[in-house]
């Protein structure tokens, strides 16, 4: 109480019956018991209540509050003017009313915690029966009851929303934990799965409002799943390292074998061997990228060395066969110009051409058949031209010559087969067969002569 404020005595005892008027006693009166004073808030214009309507002051200074429940003493005013007492206890009522109004506004605007507002309203309602104020306390009680009831509804709605939010947040973490467990159990795309687990953790950190015990259990699920994934991934790459080590050793052996074959001149067999080595290379799998690339360069260098040499040898052989074919073309041109009217001269010239033909050597398979066909046509032409006037000794000599040529080609075929030159052996056998047929034809002609 300030020096400028009249002293008053407030009582918080039970209100007496109106007929029992207290008698003043000499000496100081006890002051009011301490009660919580409503907090003052800066508010707009609020019409003050009329304390005269809800109270009275006895001649001895006793201040009475009048309410629906009756009258009760709220204090004693000994400082002079009763109007000052009405003003004092009226201001205290207005302060309490203002506090209740602010509570109501916070509740209506949603700026206050409904649970705290409800508790505050209940606490203030409990102080009304002993509040040292003059005013319409019944109206305040009704307002506090209304605030309490509405706060309870709002708090229930808030609680429902919180529970819904908690359920939704819990469901999100449940889904993330389940996804992490699925990745831990089945994922094989390790980088993608690892990135996703990190993204799950980032999202996890943004989810709040989950019950602590539930949150701890869900976190344990996620953490266990992440550990399981990391172990699986570690095991996978450890096994991959072991496999790559085995692949590396296998491919090193293939490289060594390829390098051994790179200088071979057995073109056919070595080509087949290189094809097998390449198939083995593809079946061996892959080592780590840098190792695999280095081994492949080594293998391919050996392979290229062999095939470059083979291609050069093949080109040289093909050039030789073309030259032989050109030489035999020239002999054929000479043979096809022979004058068969002088069959003795024609036969002699043809024998010389045949000897040169054999000395030239082989030609490519594509041209051999055509060249042989043309030569046999010339031989047939010369033979038929001379058959009319052959003598027996001449015919026998011719048949013997054919047999000798057949035996010569048979001998060449045997030598080629023994050396593994299959193609050359086949060609020699074909020539031997042709000459054998001519020898047999010549022998048949002798037997048919008169």
From Swiss-Prot:
Residues 1-56, 387-450 are annotated as: Disordered. The keyword Coiled coil applies. Keywords: Coiled coil. Residues 19-39 have a biased composition (Pro residues). It comes from the Bacteria. Residues 163-192 form a coiled coil. This is Uncharacterized protein MRA_2757. Residues 1-10, 395-414, 421-430 have a biased composition (Basic and acidic residues). Residues 431-450 have a biased composition (Low complexity). Binds pyrazinoic acid (POA), the active form of the first-line anti-tuberculosis prodrug pyrazinamide (PZA).
């Amino acid at each position: 109480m300030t020096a400028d404020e009249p002293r008053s005595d407030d009582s918080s005892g039970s209100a007496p019956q109106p007929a029992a008027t207290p008698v003043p006693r000499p000496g100081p009166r006890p002051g009011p018991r301490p009660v919580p004073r409503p907090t003052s808030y800066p508010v707009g214009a609020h019409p003050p209540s009329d304390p005269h309507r809800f109270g009275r002051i006895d001649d001895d200074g006793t201040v009475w509050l009048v309410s629906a429940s009756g009258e009760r003493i709220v204090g004693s005013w000994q400082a002079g003017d009763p109007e000052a007492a009405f003003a004092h206890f009226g201001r205290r009522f207005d302060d309490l009313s203002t506090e209740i109004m602010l509570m109501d506004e916070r509740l209506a605007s949603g700026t206050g915690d409904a649970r705290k507002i409800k508790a505050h309203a209940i606490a203030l309602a409990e102080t009304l029966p002993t509040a040292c104020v003059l005013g319409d306390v019944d109206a305040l009680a009704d307002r506090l009851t209304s605030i309490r009831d509405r706060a309870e509804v709002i708090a229930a709605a808030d609680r429902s929303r919180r529970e819904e939010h908690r359920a939704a947040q819990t469901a999100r973490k449940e889904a993330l934990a389940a996804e992490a467990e699925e990745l831990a159990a089945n994922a094989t795309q390790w980088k993608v799965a690892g990135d996703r687990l990190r993204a799950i953790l980032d999202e996890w950190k943004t989810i709040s409002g989950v019950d602590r015990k539930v949150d701890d259990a869900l976190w344990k699920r996620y953490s266990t799943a992440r550990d399981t994934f990391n172990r699986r991934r570690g095991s996978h790459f450890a096994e991959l390292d072991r496999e790559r080590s085995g692949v590396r050793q296998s491919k090193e052996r293939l490289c060594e074998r390829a390098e051994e074959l790179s200088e071979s001149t057995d073109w056919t067999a070595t080509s087949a061997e290189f094809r097998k080595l390449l198939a083995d290379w593809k079946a061996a799998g892959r080592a780590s990228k840098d190792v695999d690339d280095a081994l492949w360069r080594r293998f391919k260098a050996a392979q290229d060395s062999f095939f470059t040499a083979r291609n050069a040898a093949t080109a040289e052989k093909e050039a030789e066969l073309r030259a032989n074919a050109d030489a035999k073309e020239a002999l054929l041109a000479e043979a096809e110009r022979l004058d068969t009217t002088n069959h003795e001269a024609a036969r002699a010239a043809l024998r010389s051409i045949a000897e040169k033909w054999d000395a030239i050597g082989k030609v490519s398979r594509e041209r051999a058949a055509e060249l042989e066909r043309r030569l046999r046509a010339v031989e047939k032409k010369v033979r038929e031209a001379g058959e009319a006037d052959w003598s027996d000794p001449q015919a026998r000599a011719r048949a013997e010559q054919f047999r000798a040529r057949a035996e010569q080609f048979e001998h060449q075929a045997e030598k080629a087969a023994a050396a593994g030159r299959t193609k050359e052996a086949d060609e020699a056998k074909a020539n031997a067969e042709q000459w054998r047929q001519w020898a047999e034809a010549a022998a048949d002609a002798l037997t048919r002569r008169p």
